[in-house]
């Protein structure tokens, strides 16, 4: 048994992920990993596109200093439910706006329904540099059919600017696809 600091990751589910990684490395016995190595590594873990809080970078210039930008490549219903649990832990006085881009072969309606009573609005985008994405207009209609206010936007930059103009204190959550998360991170 080892007492560890919390991982440098957002979301309670990450504790389970880290525990699994540690247990796996111990069971493989190929690596001579010491407890102090694990303790040090846990505080330095970075998981790009998984509940990533964007604190610096080019995208920050499109929002107010009070807006929080989160990115997660969640693309299925199970991941959506895990992310919703994390969003439930955030400041309930801040409205959450979702920027959403998804691939065509996903369960769009079920994914979106997970966030029905959590997000204020969904802004849909096409996923750049991908062929098999669901068109933003169709995705927006699905969100509206789930009872969530939704509109389309032409770019992540405009989506961020418009959300920040509407609510300079909002949490902006970008999700729906690992490809989408990657494109957003590339812009940053």
Indicate residue ranges for each PLM-predicted region.
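ER/Golgi luminal nucleotide-sugar-dependent glycosyltransferases, focusing on the catalytic module
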Residues: 137, 185-188
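Active-site-proximal loop/hinge segments that shape catalytic or ion-binding/gating pockets
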Residues: 177
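Short, active-site-adjacent cap segments at secondary-structure transitions
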Residues: 180-182
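C-terminal helical cap/extension that packs against the catalytic core
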Residues: 65-71, 77, 112-171
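Nucleotide phosphate-binding/pyrophosphate-handling subdomain across enzymes
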Residues: 1-121
């Amino acid at each position: 048994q080892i007492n560890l600091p919390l991982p440098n990751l957002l979301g309670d589910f990450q504790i389970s992920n880290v525990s699994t990684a540690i247990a796996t490395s111990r069971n493989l016995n190929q690596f001579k990993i010491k407890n102090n190595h694990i303790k040090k590594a846990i505080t330095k873990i970075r998981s790009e596109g998984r509940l990533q809080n964007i604190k610096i970078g080019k995208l920050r210039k499109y929002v107010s200093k009070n807006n929080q930008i989160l990115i997660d490549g969640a693309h299925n219903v199970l991941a959506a439910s895990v992310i919703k649990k994390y969003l439930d832990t955030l400041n309930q006085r801040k409205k959450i706006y979702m920027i959403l881009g998804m691939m065509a072969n996903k369960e769009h309606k079920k994914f979106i329904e997970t966030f029905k009573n959590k997000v204020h609005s969904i802004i849909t985008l096409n996923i750049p540099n991908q062929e098999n994405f669901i068109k933003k207009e169709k995705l927006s209609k699905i969100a509206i059919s789930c009872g969530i206010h939704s509109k389309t936007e032409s770019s992540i930059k405009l989506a961020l600017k418009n959300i920040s103009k509407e609510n300079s204190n909002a949490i902006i959550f970008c999700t729906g696809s690992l490809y989408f998360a990657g494109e957003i991170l590339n812009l940053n």
